[in-house]
Every structure is written in structure tokens, then in C-alpha cells.
């Protein structure tokens, strides 16, 4: 796009937009790998090309700024491409929770007014059953791991890889208003129908910067830095996998995407790709640790942030006995989500393992730029003494 010419002394209003997160990895680590299961390996350089191709392909399908593109996909490099291409165009990415009932999926897609659906072939039967009820959807793009189109009566307008192959490698991503809506998803933590949540480019970038500092700057256990190998184990449809794919991309780390969560595949990838950093809910950690495939697996390099529900002390101890570093993070869908992390302070690192367990399973302390207070019914602050009960109130620049 044509850049604005600034007059001498005129300040430049630098927009906090998602495309800026790709700048540094393309300078520092353009040839570092992004891996999908045991099927695909690309570099950051190729990732950037594919993001540009996807934006061009979606444009050919009629996607315009302000439109909504819905994704039904497992954790993959393709989902990561959607994380950048769709918002970068000025459109909105809807990350569809395919675990919802068919009725709730219809409600959320219609409520979001999705124009295009990008769907993994695994979900074709689900989509086929509800397609006639999706009143705003005009186009369907099929994702297939083997590049083949399965037989389906569903009208499919393009296959993902074919769409990219037929598209140019350069798209002129605009300098959007940073308050442009980037993503939307629906939370079921309420009564009635799922409630929509959305985040702007500014909110996502600020959350990314804050959590990057929280997990990388402090001398503590579950650090994530540029020499780590990252694998999400929280679905990318759920609050952008807690925002960590954006963090991993900003840092330019090697990324490993497991697709469908299968213990054998996850453990295979952890060992083969030397994964060092993940995040998940307690049930996923337990699924992995109790899998027969975990018996002889070396998990001693693995660091895992746990959220979504309370981490049982026994499960934390089981993980540590396998050499895994674990701690807890806290947040909500509406907070993007991370608000606090149970990073032990430096002096706590010298404590014995049993004493440290009592620290890492707690909610933790606020991450940088997050203000958190406990208040009484009159909104008066209460002491942070580990005993007093009140209502949690919070404020951040991305809320």
C-alpha cells in the first residue's frame, strides 16, 4: 500500500496490528521450522508466503474487510496461517468450537455472520448436516491432509492447498486501524446460547507483548524464549490457544502442531522434535502421562503451563517426577485470556520440590500491565493474604 508521507515534526501513529508480529521472525529466524504432525515442515519464510497466498485466495473468493471467515480445524500450520491472513486483510477470523452441539454451531456461525468457512475434511459430515441452516455462508474451503477431496454432497468451492497454489505470494496487507476487529469466538461459560467475544488487533498485540514478557523475562522455571520448541495443547479455537501461537511467532521459535490430540502422536512429536514448551488443561496432561506410550518417553525438557481448571497437587507431583516443569496460569475468555502466572520468585527456586509445589499450583501473580485486586461488596480493596475472600476485579490495556 502507499505509505503516508509525514511532515517534519508530525508524529507517526504506529498501529498495533498483527502483521507487525511477523516482522522480527522473518529477520532473525526465517529458516526455522514450523511442523505439522509427521506430515509437513515449512519455514517462517514459507509461512509468510502462504499467509500472503491465503489472503489473495480469500480475496478471489469475495472476502472483503469486515467480513467473517470461520475455521473448523485442528491445531495446524494452516490454522496459524488463518491467524494472520484473515485479520491482516481487515476481515475477522471466527475460531469455531467444533465441540459444541450442532445447534450451537449453527447459532454461533449465523450470529457471527460468517461468509466463508474453512473446514477440515474430518468435520465434513458435521458441516454437511447443518449446511442448509447456515444462512450467511457463501463459500466453503476444504482442508485435506492428503490433498484429496473426499466424496461429499456438500458444495465445496476450493481445496485449501489448491487455493494457495493458484494465488500470488505477495498480498498488500494494509496498515489497519489498530481497533479493527481481528477475531471472534463464542464462550459457553454462561447460561443460554454461547456468547460472542471479540478482540481487536490492538488487544491481541498488547496481550502478546505482555505474556511474552511474563514467560520470557523472569528467572523462573516455565520460561519460553527464542531457543524453545513450542507445541500447543490447548485448541486454537479456544482463545487463540491462549495467545501462545502469536507469542511463539513473535519470538520466532520452532513450532510443532499436533493436529488431533492423540497421546501417541503428541509423545512422538515431543521426543522427535524436542518440544520444550506447551500449555494445556489438567485432563490433557493426565491423558499424556497415563498413556502407555509415555512409559519410556523422555519428558525431562518439557515445560507446561496449566490452565482452564485447578491443577491437582497430585498431578503436578506426577509431572515433576517425570522431569516436567509445570505451573498454573489464570484468565478468562474475555481477558484474552492470560492475567496471571504462578511463576516462582527467584528465592523460591531454592526451595525443596514439595514446597515449590504449593506455589506452582496457585493462581499466581499478575503478568506485566495487568492490575488485579480483590474487593469487598463496596469495591474497597482487600488484603492479598491468601485467606481473605472477595470479588476479583482486573484491568489491562487489552481489556
What positions do the PLM features span?
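Conserved structural elements of the adenylate-forming
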Residues: 48-54, 165, 197-226, 233, ...
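Conserved AMP-binding A3 loop
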Residues: 43-45, 182-209
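Structural core segment of the AMP-binding/adenylate-forming
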Residues: 21, 56, 60-61, 88-165
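Gly/Ser/Thr-rich phosphate-binding loop
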Residues: 250, 272-280, 289-358, 371, ...
Amino acid at each position: 500500500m502507499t505509505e503516508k508521507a509525514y511532515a517534519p515534526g508530525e508524529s507517526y501513529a504506529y498501529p498495533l496490528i498483527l502483521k507487525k508480529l511477523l516482522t522480527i521472525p522473518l529477520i532473525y529466524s526465517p529458516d526455522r521450522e514450523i511442523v505439522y504432525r509427521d506430515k509437513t515442515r515449512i519455514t517462517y519464510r514459507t509461512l509468510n508466503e502462504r499467509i500472503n497466498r491465503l489472503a489473495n485466495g480469500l480475496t478471489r473468493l469475495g472476502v472483503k474487510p469486515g467480513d467473517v471467515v470461520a475455521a473448523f480445524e485442528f491445531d495446524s500450520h494452516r490454522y496459524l496461517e488463518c491467524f494472520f491472513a484473515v485479520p491482516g486483510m481487515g476481515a475477522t477470523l471466527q475460531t469455531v468450537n467444533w465441540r459444541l452441539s450442532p445447534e450451537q454451531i449453527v447459532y454461533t456461525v449465523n450470529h457471527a455472520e460468517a461468509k466463508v468457512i474453512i473446514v477440515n475434511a474430518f468435520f465434513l459430515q458435521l458441516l454437511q448436516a447443518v449446511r442448509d441452516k447456515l444462512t450467511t455462508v457463501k463459500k466453503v474451503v476444504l482442508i485435506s491432509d492428503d490433498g484429496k477431496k473426499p466424496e461429499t454432497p456438500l458444495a465445496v468451492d476450493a481445496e485449501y492447498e489448491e487455493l494457495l497454489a493458484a494465488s500470488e505470494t505477495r498480498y498488500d496487507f494494509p496498515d489497519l486501524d489498530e481497533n479493527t476487529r481481528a477475531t471472534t469466538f463464542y464462550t459457553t461459560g454462561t447460561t443460554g446460547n454461547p456468547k460472542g467475544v471479540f478482540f481487536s488487533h490492538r488487544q491481541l498485540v498488547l496481550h502478546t507483548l505482555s505474556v511474552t514478557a511474563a514467560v520470557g523475562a523472569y528467572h523462573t522455571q516455565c520460561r519460553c524464549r527464542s531457543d524453545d520448541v513450542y507445541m500447543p495443547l490447548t485448541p486454537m479455537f479456544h482463545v487463540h490457544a491462549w495467545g501462545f501461537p502469536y507469542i511463539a511467532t513473535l519470538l520466532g521459535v520452532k513450532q510443532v502442531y499436533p493436529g488431533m490430540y492423540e497421546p501417541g502422536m503428541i509423545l512422538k512429536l515431543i521426543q522427535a522434535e524436542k518440544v520444550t514448551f506447551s500449555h494445556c488443561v489438567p485432563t490433557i496432561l493426565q491423558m499424556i502421562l497415563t498413556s502407555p506410550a509415555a512409559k519410556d518417553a523422555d519428558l525431562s525438557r518439557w515445560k507446561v503451563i496449566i490452565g482452564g481448571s485447578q491443577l491437582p497437587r497430585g498431578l503436578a507431583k506426577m509431572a515433576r517426577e517425570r522431569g516436567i516443569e509445570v505451573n498454573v496460569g489464570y484468565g478468562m475468555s474475555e481477558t484474552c485470556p492470560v492475567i496471571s502466572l504462578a511463576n516462582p520468585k527467584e528465592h523460591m527456586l531454592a526451595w525443596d520440590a514439595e514446597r515449590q509445589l504449593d506455589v506452582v499450583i496457585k493462581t499466581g501473580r499478575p503478568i506485566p500491565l495487568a492490575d488485579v485486586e480483590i474487593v469487598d461488596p463496596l469495591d474497597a480493596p482487600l488484603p492479598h493474604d491468601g485467606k481473605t475472600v472477595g470479588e476479583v476485579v482486573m484491568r489491562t490495556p487489552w481489556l
